[in-house]
Amino acid sequence: MTCRTRFAPSPTGYLHIGGARTALYCWLEARHRGGEFVLRIEDTDRERSTQGAIDAILEAMEWLGLDYDEGPIYQTDRVARYLEVAEQLVADGKAYYAYETREELDAMREAAMARQEKPRYNGAARDLGLPRRDDPNRVIRFKNPLEGTVVFDDLIKGRIEIANSELDDMVIFRPDGYPTYNFAVVVDDWDMGITEVIRGDDHINNTPRQINLYEGIGAPVPKFGHMPMILDEQGAKLSKRTGAADVMQYKDAGYLPDALLSYLARLGWSHGDQELFSRQELIELFDVKDCNSKASRLDMAKLGWVNQHFLKTEDVAAIVPHLVYQLQKLGLDVAAGPAPEDVVVALRERVQTLKEMAEKAVVWYQPLTEYDEAAVAKHFKAGAEVALGKARELLAALPEWTAESVGVALHDAAAALEIGMGKVAQPLRVAITGTQVSPDISHTVYLAGREQALKRIDVAITKVATA
């Protein structure tokens, strides 16, 4: 049987970090087993579902590179199918119409609580065989088995059992003509041939009800794997402030998608002591059965370390589009400065995020208007104009402008003046960037471009002369 997994977010908000991990695990399980991955949008909550949230989820999936073989499939396009299955259950005596008012249901639950029992529906209409009629309170309820136990072997948590006496006859179709969550997902999984359901353990209480529904409609029951939640660094539930942010905020913060996926994979799964994984390694090694049953903690410092590794080792061409995004976010004209791939080469060893890389690269994409006073005082001393002038002379004469040729010219300038390389490099660094901190001097000058580099050296020579 072909492995088929599904990621089924509700479009009531952005895709947060926990949802991204769920999507990743579902995707990896399918890819590892040579199966298929389905994206399903569970949008039957009409009051809370929004098109903006749908768009945000799709954008995040695309950025993460989690491609799907089928979908997106929208539950709101399948309401007629859900009703068809629900009415067949009624015809088969496995479900029934009920018409209690809100007040009657509240009284029913209050009476149960007064008896110190679990507040739930008491099955009043279960055996009445009421016909379908127009009524604002009309629902369809599933006849949950009255006896026996639901048993399933969770792929992550092991064997779980719950007595049917703990469950009531749940509503499967609401008065508004829409299916409930538990019913819609079961029909979807049946129709879509889902073989493994991997999701957060906040859904674990739904599983016994859903298993009874699968069996009630005559569908094969998929395997279930429930992942523990991700906690913040203090061990508390994630909040927006502590990391439960929109996945796209991680993009804006300058993380590479492959770095984020590598980090997320380790938040609940492991392969020996290995800390870093390429996308292909994850596909080859992942097995949901290897997931941990205990909650993981989000560690932003660790994520930064992982991202730094990927910036240093990933192909330059793969990093460039993400750097361009960051440069454009800063309002920079990318065409007016150095090639982004050259910026990556110059800065990849010096930064932890792409946002930091872009901020350091600003000096090469816009005019230099400010100088660090301490840098000027330290390096624009009398005599610096000689080193700057010699460097300018040799740079202007270069037949080809490359980082290598620039480096040779600067060393030649130092040799010609019989001074240390630092006597040339430091005033030149201030001349080009306005500061005394930058990548190696050959890349710093090269990235400015010949025209801008010579202009900035001329300005610096004037500043030294008038100091």
UniProtKB/Swiss-Prot annotation:
Function (record text): Catalyzes the attachment of glutamate to tRNA(Glu) in a two-step reaction: glutamate is first activated by ATP to form Glu-AMP and then transferred to the acceptor end of tRNA(Glu).
PROSITE patterns: AA_TRNA_LIGASE_I
Enzyme nomenclature, EC number: 6.1.1.17
Protein name: Glutamate--tRNA ligase
InterPro entries: aa-tRNA-synth_I_cd-bd, aa-tRNA-synth_I_codon-bd_sub2, aa-tRNA-synth_I_CS, aa_tRNA-synth_I_cd-bd_sf, Glu-tRNA-ligase_bac/mito, Glu/Gln-tRNA-synth, Glu/Gln-tRNA-synth_Ib_cat-dom, GluQ/Sye
CDD domains xrefs: GluRS_core (cd00808)
Similarity comment text for this entry: Belongs to the class-I aminoacyl-tRNA synthetase family. Glutamate--tRNA ligase type 1 subfamily.
Binding-site residues, ATP: K240
Motif ('HIGH' region): 9-19
Keywords: Aminoacyl-tRNA synthetase, ATP-binding, Cytoplasm, Ligase, Nucleotide-binding, Protein biosynthesis
Main location: cytoplasm
Keyword Cytoplasm: yes
Subcellular location: Cytoplasm
Gene Ontology MF term list: ATP binding; glutamate-tRNA ligase activity; tRNA binding; zinc ion binding
Motif ('KMSKS' region): 237-241
One CC-aspect GO term: cytosol
Stretches of the chain forming a coiled coil according to its record: none
Reactions catalysed, as given in the entry: tRNA(Glu) + L-glutamate + ATP = L-glutamyl-tRNA(Glu) + AMP + diphosphate
Assembly and interaction partners: Monomer.
Encoding gene (name): gltX
GO biological process: glutamyl-tRNA aminoacylation
